[in-house]
C-alpha cells in the first residue's frame, strides 16, 4: 500500500487513526501492530510468514541474550542466531539469485536460479536493519530486551516507517512504546499533519512531476508519453537535463516519503529521527553523506564503522573501514553491479576528501558546492543505470561523449518553471518562509489546507506512482 494513493489517504489512514485514538491506553500498541500487519499484507500477503519469523527470531533471541547475561558463550550464540536469521532472509530474497548469476557469468558455472523469489518483500532492507540493531543493542546492554511480543511487533512493523524508513532503532521509540496514557499531544498531532502534508506535496507535486521529465527524456519501454525521446535519440545536453531531473525526483520522492512517515509517527505519538537535511546544499561529498539518508548512514557508522575501529586506528585503517561501509552501502541498495560500482565510487571520493581534499573544500565558497553537485549527479547516473531499461553504458557515453540529437529547449520551455521551483525547494528557503507563515494561525492553517487539497487532487487524477525506494 502506497501512502500517496486514494485507498491509503481516505480509507486505511483515517480508519487506523480512529481505531488507535479510540482504543484503551493498554491496547494502543495492539491496534498499531494489527493495523500495521494489515498494511503490510495488503500487497505482500505471501510474505507474511517472513515478517512473523523475523519478529519471532529477534524477540526470542533478545530474551535469551538478556537471560544468559552471565554466560558470554550463550549470549554470543543467540546473537548469532538473530544475525543469521535476519541477514539470512535478506540474503535469500535479495541477493541469492544475483550471486548465482554473477558466479555463472564470472566462473562459467551453470547454477540454476532459485524459483519463486523474483519479487523482493517490500521494505525488507529497512526492517531487517531495525531488527539487527535491536538484537545488537540488547547484546551490548544498550537496551533491555522487550518482553511483550506485541510491543516488539509494533516496533518492527509500525506502518509509517515499515516500507522505506526512516530506519528507527528500538531505543529511539522504546520509551514511547511504553507510554500508554497521554502518548500524544495536540501539538504533536498538528506537527504530524503538517509534516505529512508537506511530504505528500513533495511526492505528488514535485517528485512525480519532475519524474515525468525524466521519463519523457530517457523513456521506458511502455511509456505512454507523446514526447517520448529515448536515450539513443537524446543529445548530450538533453541527457544531462534528464539525469538532473532524476536527481531531483529521487530526493523529493524519498524525502517526501520520510517526511510523511515521520509525520504519521508524530500522529501516533512517536518521534522518528530525521532522514534528510538539504543534502543538495552540501559543499563536500563528506557533508552530503551527513545530510542524505541519515538513518542509514548512522546505522552503518554505529554498527559497522565504529566496531571496525572508526577513526581510532590510524589513517590506513580509516580508509579500510570507509571501504567496507561504502561497499555495504552500495550492496544494501540493490543486488546489481551498478549499485556496487556506486558504492565504490563514493568510497573513492570520500577517501580522496579524507586524505587531502577536504581541507581545500572547507576554504572555498562557491566551487565546493558545484563540485559536490556534479559528482552527486554523476553518482545518480550510476544508480539509475541498471536493469530498469536504462542502459548503463549508453547513459555514460551520452553524458561524457558529446553527441547530437533531440535538443533540450522544448523540455526547458515546458518544465523550466518546475525545475526552478524544485531547485528552490532543495534549499532551506522554503523552511524559512514556512517559519514566517506559521506564526499566524490563519496563514498556517490555510497553507496546509491548500497544499493538502491540491496534492489530493493530483492523487485522484493520476495513476499510482510507487515511491522509488520501495525497490530497495
PLM regions: where:
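Membrane-embedded transmembrane alpha-helical bundles that form the catalytic cores
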Residues: 1-471
Amino acid at each position: 500500500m502506497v501512502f500517496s494513493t486514494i485507498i491509503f489517504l481516505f480509507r486505511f489512514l483515517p480508519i487506523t487513526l480512529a481505531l488507535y485514538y479510540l482504543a484503551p491506553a493498554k491496547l494502543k500498541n495492539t491496534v498499531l501492530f494489527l493495523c500495521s500487519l494489515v498494511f503490510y499484507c495488503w500487497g505482500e500477503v505471501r510474505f507474511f510468514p517472513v515478517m512473523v519469523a523475523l519478529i519471532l527470531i529477534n524477540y526470542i533471541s533478545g530474551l535469551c541474550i538478556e537471560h544468559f547475561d552471565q554466560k558470554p558463550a550463550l549470549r554470543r550464540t543467540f546473537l548469532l542466531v538473530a544475525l543469521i536469521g535476519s541477514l539470512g532472509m535478506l540474503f535469500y530474497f535479495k541477493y541469492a539469485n544475483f550471486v548465482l548469476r554473477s558466479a555463472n557469468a564470472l566462473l562459467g558455472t551453470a547454477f540454476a536460479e532459485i524459483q519463486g523469489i523474483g519479487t523482493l518483500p517490500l521494505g525488507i532492507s529497512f526492517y531487517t536493519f531495525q531488527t539487527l540493531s535491536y538484537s545488537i543493542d540488547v547484546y551490548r546492554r544498550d537496551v533491555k530486551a522487550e518482553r511483550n511480543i506485541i510491543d516488539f511487533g509494533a516496533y518492527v512493523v509500525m506502518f509509517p516507517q515499515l516500507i522505506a524508513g526512516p530506519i528507527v532503532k528500538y531505543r529511539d521509540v522504546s520509551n514511547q512504546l511504553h507510554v500508554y496514557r497521554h502518548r500524544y499531544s495536540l501539538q504533536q498531532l498538528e506537527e504530524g499533519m503538517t509534516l505529512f502534508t508537506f511530504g505528500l506535496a513533495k511526492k505528488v507535486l514535485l517528485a512525480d512531476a519532475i519524474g515525468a521529465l525524466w521519463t519523457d527524456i530517457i523513456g521506458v519501454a511502455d511509456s505512454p508519453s507523446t514526447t517520448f525521446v529515448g536515450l539513443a535519440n537524446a543529445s548530450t545536453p538533453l541527457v544531462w537535463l534528464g539525469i538532473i531531473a532524476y536527481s531531483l525526483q529521487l530526493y523529493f520522492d524519498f524525502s517526501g516519503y520520510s517526511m510523511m512517515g515521520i509525520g504519521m509517527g508524530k500522529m501516533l505519538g512517536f518521534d522518528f529521527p530525521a532522514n534528510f537535511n538539504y543534502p543538495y546544499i552540501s559543499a563536500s561529498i563528506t557533508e552530503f553523506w551527513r545530510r542524505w539518508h541519515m538513518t542509514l548512514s548512522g546505522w552503518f557508522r554505529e554498527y559497522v564503522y565504529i566496531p571496525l575501529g572508526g577513526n581510532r586506528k590510524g589513517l590506513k585503517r580509516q580508509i579500510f573501514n570507509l571501504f567496507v561501509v561504502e561497499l555495504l552501502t552500495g550492496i544494501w541498495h540493490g543486488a546489481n553491479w551498478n549499485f556496487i560500482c556506486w558504492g565504490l565510487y563514493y568510497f573513492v571520493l570520500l577517501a580522496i576528501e579524507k586524505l587531502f581534499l577536504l581541507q581545500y573544500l572547507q576554504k572555498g565558497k562557491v566551487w565546493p558546492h558545484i563540485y559536490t553537485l556534479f559528482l552527486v549527479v554523476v553518482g545518480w547516473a550510476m544508480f539509475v543505470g541498471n536493469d530498469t531499461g536504462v542502459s548503463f553504458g549508453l547513459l555514460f557515453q551520452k553524458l561524457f561523449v558529446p553527441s547530437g540529437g533531440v535538443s533540450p529547449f522544448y523540455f526547458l520551455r515546458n518544465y523550466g518553471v518546475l525545475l526552478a521551483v524544485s531547485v528552490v525547494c532543495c534549499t532551506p528557503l522554503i523552511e524559512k518562509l514556512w517559519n514566517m507563515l506559521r506564526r499566524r494561525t490563519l496563514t498556517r492553517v490555510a497553507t496546509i489546507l491548500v497544499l493538502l487539497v491540491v496534492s489530493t487532487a493530483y492523487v485522484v487524477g493520476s495513476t499510482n506512482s510507487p515511491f522509488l525506494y520501495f525497490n530497495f
